[in-house]
Amino acid sequence: MRECISIHIGQAGIQVGNARWELYCLEHGIQPDGQMPSDKTVGGGDDAFNTFFSETGAGKHVPRAVFLDLEPTVIDEVRTGTYRQLFHPEQLISGKEDAANNFARGHYTIGKEIVDLCLDRIRKLADNCTGLQGFLVFHAVGGXTGSGLGSLLLERLSVDYGKKSKLGFTVYPSPQVSTSVVEPYNSVLSTHSLLEHTDVSVLLDNEAIYDICRRSLDIERPTYTNLNRLVSQVISSLTASLRFDGALNVDVTEFQTNLVPYPRIHFMLSSYAPVISAEKAYHEQLSVAEITNSAFEPASMMAKCDPRHGKYMACCLMYRGDVVPKDVNAAVATIKTKRTIQFVDWCPTGFKCGINYQPPTVVPGGDLAKVQRAVCMISNSTSVAEVFSRIDHKFDLMYAKRAFVHWYVGEGMEEGEFSEAREDLAALEKDYEEVGAESGEGEEGDEGEEY
């Protein structure tokens, strides 16, 4: 079996986790108490959904997941929520005091007290797997638990499970909407370790997803629940082929192979289509070509950056529902002829497609319409550099005056770590610039030295 262990860190990670497991349970017909009436064989471990759920002797399905936070309030919502019986109490780990938006608290002082307990729980989950294929990590880098404890945990996972792939779903700070003053510091420090310790990172940003909810679903004032449900559709589409059978199945390690041209260039954009409200869907059924085009629309991107400003290196299209390979090939051929969608010249094919026959499931009472077919796109584009340069700029403005730095140093960090992380990101921006440049002007020499 190819099991995946999910790790949800900090408030963002946990709330995305809630939406995600709610959706998975609906997709597989698992009740909130973990029972699955449709699953006749008790303890049968060969079903496709066992990649994400383990089955107990009593026929209860338990997510292979750990939720962790440094303060209890958010996890207490899981402990008392609808799905409280789904999780084993040991999977919900909470500390006593907050990381207080401080990377250093999450990474050094408070994080290091809890990290061994987390690794212990993860080890238990891993021992329960027959063929662990990797970890999915959900966190935000603007706060402190997601950034500090998230980085610490990823570093430790690299040591303990060196060869297993790690996929991150990372909420980055948005250009306009800010939740804390020190976001730029936390993000830069955290990205510094994401660069080294994740294999693929999917960037999400709240503002972009707000706009999608407002524009496509006509929700005037989207809540986090609206956002998280949209994000969990994306994550569900990504993992659908691990959980259901289809024509073209895609493994987690396959994302890495197909999307990451150089180890550092692994920050992905994602988009999902069709995002339409129930009222509209009643009147229109979208074809494969239409949803494919809409997945490439800059407005569909779940991070605030414009793919027209960069070039695509690779892109992965995951279709689900009523889709046949012939339609997919036609849609992809059309995309390739469009001048607005440009690929780097050293990657001529650039597309990986997956098809899964399970149509998208929607949460009852949710905002998304039930549709026959949907597509989720994960793409590696040089325009992602915009996200980093925006954060770097804000970092520089604050760091020039050393504003707020004493809070980090007081928690046992050294000032040198700031400049080291910032230099690493400067190098990353440069890497993206070089990758997007036209090849052939003697750049091959430089690249050989760099990687």
UniProtKB/Swiss-Prot annotation:
The lineage's top-level taxon is: Eukaryota
Compartments annotated for it: namely: Cytoplasm, Cytoskeleton
UniProt-annotated site: Involved in polymerization, residues: Y451
The record's gene field reads TUBA1
**Native species of this protein?**
Anemia phyllitidis
Q: Which residues form the active site?
A: E254
Q: Does the keyword Transcription regulation apply?
A: no
Spell out the protein name for this chain: Tubulin alpha-1 chain
Which residues of the sequence carry a binding annotation for GTP?
A: Q11, E71, T145, T179, N206, N228
Task: Look up the signal peptide feature and give its range.
Answer: none
